UniProtKB/Swiss-Prot annotation:
A motif ('HIGH' region) lies at residues 125-135. PANTHER family: ARGININE--TRNA LIGASE, CYTOPLASMIC, ARGINYL-TRNA SYNTHETASE. This is Arginine--tRNA ligase. It catalyses: tRNA(Arg) + L-arginine + ATP = L-arginyl-tRNA(Arg) + AMP + diphosphate. Belongs to the class-I aminoacyl-tRNA synthetase family. NCBIfam families: argS. The gene is argS. GO terms for cellular component: cytoplasm. GO terms for molecular function: arginine-tRNA ligase activity; ATP binding.
């Protein structure tokens, strides 16, 4: 039983005994005592002054005396104005640690068969280039969010919508056709997504050269862009694709398959995955159908040019285009089509879209349209909106010199982690295979933690060098502390020390030890809050605060060399449960923690 729950029950009994009145539990406010005051938990007594008919200090004194006499969990109390500060007994903290120790998945709530089904969409790449730094933040946030939502007792389906059609895809197809000379991932030794991305860049290069040449002949920029033979060929290819031209479709399928193989490798390295992948080529026609259905029902209207629109002025928005006059779709049409397919595939209770904040308006509109079209979860659609991520100027430029590929970023992080770990002696005594694995865990952990510790709504700068520091609020600092605790536990096991199911309760704990138990116990509430707020950063910063406190404890107190056997057992058990919570917390963020370093 939580200490807070125990104290709330005793306060209710005390108010009945002292003032003869029943009080609902919701009226009893307990909060953590401020650091400058003595105590662990503070009771606000102002709500009880009417029934006590006394001043706040006297009321607090009377309640404190009652609790001290009748509730074994209260060791002492002090009164500051209208606040009653309660010091929890050491035996009660040890009892709480015993409860946490018996729960291998402390703080994690499993879904039962009646749990709500939450679908989370993230990644959403285009099949004309590799995943880049922006996708890294998206994937890491989406994956962590899915883990956190699942840890709060929900069923979760992780989905991805791949933008696999359109003019941008035709650009890389046409460039490969013109300049590729039959090059394949196998013949070039390149990942498929990188190879296709190179042809997208090649298209852009040739197109710009064409435009410049036409402008030299006297055309304006707009005229030159419209007259570009290369761009017109790409448009023709798109028309052929829409018409189902077998040759164009075969080329499209071949090049997309190269990209998917590349994406799969990137996702695997990054440690993210999906339960279901949707493709825009399958959803956009469904969207058209659903929009026409909405038109027939009078939800939408048609303009003279044949385009279909939604009038959202009643919702405080404007008119929104859903189908162009030539019948071609827009992004909104695709999202409606994808929603239709998803609704047919799964009994969704809530849908969360992990998409950058430049799409805030789009999702506001989508929510209204889905609701109009009869999707029950339309109103409860969540747009998990996040800010942009950049690199410090001049760092890690990609081959194109503009965007940083996810693969290059991860490779550089792993290489830097290996170099830094070797310099600090963290890989001493390990085999080559073990050292490589530690470098991978630390490099990716540094990347993931640095991104996830930041409030998702904020724009951020990812600093590779800063992220691999073994000191401060970083992934490697947390990972090293975890490895340190695992080393303590290994030595304890080698010495034949076994943590009992019930720890001796006859020891006096220090303030630091009580504080650490309180922090470990907080993990369940932190996971719950992160689920309510959709906040991976809440988990990240909690774990950092916990390991920072543990490091101070590790330096200030003997653990294995402690002479009092009961105290030694307690400190080993405390260390084991801190390691457990760190592993669970980092696991929710998709970050591995090494057993040794």
């Amino acid at each position: 039983m939580k200490i807070e729950d125990k104290l709330v029950t005793s306060v209710i009994s005390g108010l009945k005994a002292l003032y003869g009145q029943d009080v609902p539990a919701a009226q009893v406010q307990l909060q953590k005592t401020k650091k400058e005051f003595e105590g662990h938990l503070t009771l606000v007594v102002f709500p009880f002054l009417k029934m006590s008919k006394k001043g706040p200090e006297q009321t607090a004194q009377e309640i404190g005396e009652y609790l001290k006499a009748n509730e074994p969990a209260v060791a002492a109390f002090n009164v500051i104005k209208g606040f009653l500060n309660l010091t929890v007994a050491s035996a009660t903290w040890i009892e709480l640690l015993n409860e946490i120790h018996t729960d291998a998945q402390y703080g994690i709530v499993s879904a039962d068969e009646n749990a709500p089904l939450v679908m989370i969409e993230y990644s959403s790449p285009n099949t004309n280039k590799p995943l880049h730094l922006g996708h890294v933040r998206n994937n890491l946030l989406g994956n962590a969010l899915a883990n956190i939502v699942m840890a709060n007792g929900n069923k979760v389906v992780k989905t991805n919508i791949v933008n696999d059609r359109g003019i941008h895809i035709c650009k890389s197809m046409l460039a490969w056709q013109k300049y590729g000379k039959g090059e394949t991932p196998e013949s070039s030794g390149k990942k498929g997504d990188h190879l296709v991305g190179d042809y997208y860049v090649a298209f852009d290069k040739h197109y710009k050269a064409e435009v410049a040449e036409l402008m030299e002949k006297g055309m304006s920029k707009e005229e030159a862009e419209a007259a570009s033979p290369l761009m017109n060929e790409a448009r023709e290819m798109l028309v052929k694709w829409e018409a189902g031209d077998p040759e164009v479709r075969a080329l499209w399928q071949m090049m997309n398959n190269w990209v998917y193989a590349g994406f799969d490798e990137t996702y695997r390295k990054m440690g993210v995955g999906f339960d279901k992948i949707y493709y825009e080529s399958n959803t956009y026609l469904e969207g058209k159908e659903k929009v026409m259905e909405g038109l027939e029902k009078g939800f939408f209207f048609k303009k003279e040019d044949g385009s279909v629109w939604a009038d959202l002025t009643a919702e405080g928005l404007d008119h929104k285009l859903l189908l162009r006059g030539d019948g071609t779709s827009v992004y909104m049409t695709q999202d409606i089509g994808t929603a239709k397919l998803r609704f047919a595939d799964y009994p969704i209770d809530k849908m969360i879209y992990v998409v950058g904040n430049e799409q805030n308006y789009h999702f506001q509109v989508l929510s209204i349209l889905l609701d109009k079209l009869g999707f029950e979860w339309g109103k409860s659609l969540v747009h998990f909106s996040y800010g942009m991520v950049e690199l410090p100027e001049g760092k890690m430029k990609s081959r194109e010199g503009t965007v940083v590929d996810a693969d290059d970023l991860m490779a550089e992080m792993i290489a830097t982690a290996k170099e830094t770990s070797q310099e600090l002696g963290k890989l001493d005594g390990l085999t080559q295979e073990e050292a490589d694995d530690i470098a991978r865990i630390v490099g990716l952990g540094a990347l993931k933690y640095f991104i996830l510790k930041v409030d998702a709504r904020k724009n951020m700068t990812f600093n590779p060098k800063e992220s691999i520091d073994f000191n401060g609020n970083t992934g490697p600092f947390i990972q090293y502390t975890y490895a340190r605790i695992r080393s303590v536990l290994r030595k304890a096991a080698e010495a034949g020390i076994v943590i009992p199911e019930v720890l001796p309760a006859n020891i006096e704990l220090s303030e630091k030890e009580e504080g650490l138990i309180q922090m470990v116990a907080d993990f369940a509430a932190v996971v719950r809050q992160a689920g309510e707020d959709y906040s991976p950063s809440g988990i990240a910063n909690y774990v950092y605060d916990l390991v920072k406190e543990y490091n101070q404890f590790y330096h200030d107190f003997s653990i294995l060399r402690e002479e009092n056997e009961d105290v030694k057992l307690f400190r080993i058990a405390l260390s084991a449960n801190i390691a457990k919570v760190v592993r669970l917390g980092m696991g929710l963020l998709g970050i591995e923690v090494p057993d040794r370093m």
